[in-house]
């Protein structure tokens, strides 16, 4: 074979760019909204324009591309819309840091327009990198439909959706206790807050009862908020305090008189049984305050400092104010004690700041009217969630859903399309271009709301905006909406998935997708090194890479699987992996790990393993090419003579058909790991390690006729074409490269059909590319009765020979001489002998009536067939030991099955087929044992 035509080694770098350019030039990725084919559409979860792709992006886009390529080959009109997300808080934060580092300036040093220009510049650069990386990964997106969550179409959709909900009264504005990030100075939705268990203190503080010498003591984790206290609450059933309900106490430092109230929400066993109520700075207190119509006093500025309501503590940070208040309380004799206490603390998922419950005027979406439909879509299976165990999580979250705070105090994002009158409370919601007519007439009297919408508001409309909504005449919308499936991580089931269902169904009264597949989160291996004091730090750099490659860990270093994080040193860059291993190896690794919603443990060994498989695929194909290079597609068109097919040929065709059936089922339930495993095993084990090894003597002219050799070559070409089709959705680059080589080698037949064996392969060769070839279908032949049982016996005979070779410590390269004794299954043995020779490393196999008397041999029994291997004289003792071990094993098995069959309970209750199977097993074991005993006697 010419080295230039088919290099010995596969080099991903030299082929991937060219293959992708070929796909793009051919226009294969572009969907046709006017096509009569059934539609299959996916909208890409848009990566944030904050930086570059991470391994999570590589995973989710590999899975989507696998589905898209599979459905494209099945004849669907596929449309995969790529896009990027403006990611309000995240992107603004990144750009602010960039400007601080590069120019030494804060956001507030710029006008809003100037700052946004910097953000748009950042977005362009980041987006270009992201889209380039998606191409490297092999994503077959329709780039002509590329979207951005703040492009003009998205902006129209967002304004339209806001106005629809505003006009229905679903969107409202009001004061509410929100999650406030004092660093980013914006409100966050409940699910944007992460909770951490932190050690702190429980402070005990005394309040003096008005007109009394009595004091009431409360326990609190936040003494600084006493400046905003508006009540003390006790349980009405707590006899210690029942006489004080209705009395008043004085709040220290601000001298405010507040009531002692009875409320059944108070836990009398916590602290002293009395709690301070600060409605403006605690969510539970807010509810109590609403129930008792208490004043709500905000004591903090947006930056987290004490405001003018804090008296002498005005201007202090929360932390400093806490210390000063405790000191001052001690001086007044009002501080009792503090106790160590652990509590859950809310933390901003973006800035890491401790969240402050903060009374603020914000925009909200009322969710009560959507709750039934959100449940209904899933309960009726109009939306199917995979894996199904997440259905319960979804429904629990919907049942506990609270009004959604959608306003953010940012500059980057969709500006809220509402104008406020400067002189009264009038507002105008406007979804057109420019501004409302009233504003145009009198611009000095109006101002647009300065806030922007939560990123998830625009992301919630993503499936609609990608296909042209609110233009209801959009061909894309009619053809491709709703989409087929949403593929995403289970961590944003509530962030995004539920909001898409809410927003899209509110606009068009239809679910946005039929299925949701939630993959697991990627974990990487990190290494913690402990010092003598028991303190630890993360190992990084060369040492970590050495450990990743298998270097033994010292006693003070512990490996742990953790979520990917730069600080932990366990981040794996997908682009670095593509450069090192090739895109196909990366994709196959990710698919093989993509379990259903569980933790995904990813390390370098997996990339190495699947790179080796890619090389195996190349080398296996290269071997096959060497034996089919003289064939043409016309030879395939002629078909094969099925009378010349052997047991091994029927076996590989049966295995291939079974592979297709299993893979189709796994695609339907998104079991990507099983799809990858099945395809991997078929090519590596069934095709290469088994079938190719069996037929090598025929291919090399050492056995069988020329006609049989020609038949096997046609079958090899057919199998290679088909398995490339099966593998293509997962490993598209190498399969396309090999497919094009097949087309160049075999040529194409314009109208040829082939037969039931070769026909589909001939059809595939007529395709321009592997990615648009029709997906493989079962190959129909007249399979012999008992095929699987017969080949199974052949495999067990091979295993027995290999086992004897291993136990006798025979040289693996030494050809063996074997014999078979079977009066009942002579024809089956004749068929099995070539397989035994090829896979068992046996030079000759003779069928005998009885064991040779003048030879030393080792014997095994399979289904009543005795198989023996001739041994050198020095192996006599080893054979006796082996037979004794086999005798012990069989005696234990016979004893166990005999006891089971002696049980009347088993015989009467068990399935009759199971009882019969046990009887057959017992007979076979007894026969094998007798053979072993005879052999031992002869020794």
Curated annotation (Swiss-Prot):
Motif ('HIGH' region): 47-57
Chain segments annotated as coiled-coil in the UniProt record: 874-939
Entries under Pfam families matching the protein: Anticodon_1, tRNA-synt_1, Val_tRNA-synt_C
Family annotation (PROSITE patterns): AA_TRNA_LIGASE_I
Chief location category: cytoplasm
Motif annotated as 'KMSKS' region, chain positions: 563-567
Record protein name field: Valine--tRNA ligase
Source lineage: Bacteria, Pseudomonadati, Chlamydiota, Chlamydiia, Chlamydiales
